[in-house]
Design a protein with these regions (language model features):
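Conserved redox-cofactor binding core of oxidoreductases
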Residues: 55-57
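A conserved helix-loop-beta module that forms one wall/lid of the active-site cleft
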Residues: 80-92
């Protein structure tokens, strides 16, 4: 699969949905003229009939190779010999796809010179909207799921398939990690214990980094990365006396960040700075935890990164197509606002502790997956307070 499309196949990709339709709703499949993502259809409507998908979103269909930049005839033919003819052309992400339709100009008064941007995915635009437009920056989105992505000049193909090889929306590439467990376990803990975010943060003051080697592997609803759909959470090292609200709280947040870090460790980057977005990014505890575990300065970005990125991308494309040589960086920089009060740098006293905890976490997950690894019980001894 990786040799064919430079990615593994995921159930959330478009390929699996079309495959399901072809097997279970054959009449609907046969009557489909063109498959599009939602924003491709919006563009189709705005332009009055342009069928187009751009490279960023095509990367996530599970049918298009972002390295060869073409639809996979082998994969499409496995689903149906007719599928390739039902897929739209893939346009460049740095060009518009056409003008707004005459009908919409007449009905709503749009400027007839209005061009329609090709559009892209939320993570591609999230990179722009958080100021992540040059190599060396890592954006982490802390929502129901967690994502981490960066910009690189050449494609990165992960032989394990855990890091997605995507095109970005600037003509470059966006290696992307997605874990399915992030805010879900945290929010459930708050709800079960009747805690506010500030009360949760207060609990953290009663414990110390490393949690004496008591680790929670937060696979609450299976896990996407690593690909373990039937997984459940693991509470490692907790004695009966350790099962306090305070220690479980620390184990939970450390586990979520460690789960993200373990996937990130396969990415082709040593970040010089991390930009944070998503609901949990405005928490001092989460920011500091990420700074310490990733051993890198971490700063939350204010606003809706993906929405801002879409607007800035459209402005950049408009400028380019109207003779301006203004760089994307120059356009983006004035609009990015950081929450300086929550800017966190790694604490020297925590870095060594978390280096040991990262090794312990990795040994636990490797043993569970049958991949060998070091003895987690032995590693835990070095983390006892």
């Amino acid at each position: 699969m990786i040799a064919e499309i430079s990615n593994s196949q995921r159930t959330g990709y478009t390929a699996s949905k079309i495959f399901h339709m072809q097997r279970n709703e054959i009449e609907l499949f046969n009557n489909t003229y063109q498959f599009m993502l939602v924003h491709n259809y919006v563009n189709y409507f705005l332009t009055g009939g342009v069928f187009a998908m751009e490279e960023g979103d095509a990367s996530g269909t599970g049918l298009w190779d972002p390295v060869k930049k073409k639809w996979s005839e082998s994969l499409t033919s496995i689903i149906s010999k007719d599928l390739l003819s039902k897929l739209p052309p893939v346009s460049s992400s740095i060009e518009s796809i056409g003008n707004i339709s005459k009908e919409l100009v007449k009905e709503y008064g749009f400027n007839s010179a209005c061009r329609i941007d090709a559009g892209s995915g939320d993570n591609m635009y999230g990179a722009i909207g958080t100021g992540n437009i040059d190599p060396g920056i890592l954006t982490i989105s802390l929502g129901t799921s967690g994502t981490a992505y960066t910009i690189v000049e050449t494609p990165f193909v992960d032989p394990t398939g855990e890091i997605a090889c995507f095109c970005d929306s600037t003509g470059r590439y966006l290696p992307l990690l997605c874990v399915s467990n992030m805010a879900g376990g945290y929010n459930s803990f708050l709800e079960k214990n009747g805690l506010s975010h500030s009360e949760f943060e207060a609990l953290m003051t009663y414990t110390h980094p490393g949690n004496d080697g008591n680790v929670i592997v937060p696979w609450y609803e299976g896990e996407r990365t690593p690909d373990l759909p039937n997984a459940s959470p693991i509470y490692f090292g907790f004695s009966y006396d350790d099962l306090t609200k305070e220690k479980v709280a620390r184990g939970l947040i450390e586990g979520h960040v460690l789960n993200l870090y373990e996937g990130f460790s396969k990415m082709p980057i040593e970040p010089k700075e991390i930009y944070l977005t998503g609901g949990l990014s405005q928490s001092k505890v989460w920011c500091q935890m990420i700074a310490d575990i990733f051993n890198c300065k971490a700063t939350p970005v204010l606003g809706e990164g993906a929405a801002l990125g879409a607007a800035l991308h459209a402005g950049w494309i408009w400028n380019n197509e109207n003779g301006s040589n203004e760089t994307l960086s120059k356009i983006v920089k004035p609009f990015i606002t950081f929450n300086e009060q929550l800017r966190c740098t790694p604490k020297d006293e925590n870095i060594k502790v978390y280096d040991n905890l990262k090794s312990l976490y990795s040994s636990i997950t490797m043993r569970i997956r049958g991949l060998g690894g070091k003895d987690p019980f032995e590693l835990k001894q070095g983390l006892k307070g």
